[in-house]
Amino acid sequence: MVKVVKRDGKEEEFIPEKIVVSILKAGAPVDVARRIAKKVECMVMERENVTAKELTRYILAELKKVNEEWYRNWIVFDQAVKRRRTEEELK
């Protein structure tokens, strides 16, 4: 089972449904959210662990390919709610 290494160093089980929920919050429909979550899951399934930043990078890359507005919504949400500067952190 893949573990996610959170920004604070804690580890938790990789749960694809969390990706789906986050993408839904960005405005994408369920089918798109599930498709992106499945792609990301396939990217990491052979690994022992993955960092939260890596996951975010993968998710945003896929989201941007599909819809620039949903990508922007994710960034705005991270800035407003989570107080993160996601685009800068991922450079």
Place the predicted regions along the sequence by residue:
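Long, C-terminal-biased catalytic regions of enzyme "large/alpha" subunits
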Residues: 1-91
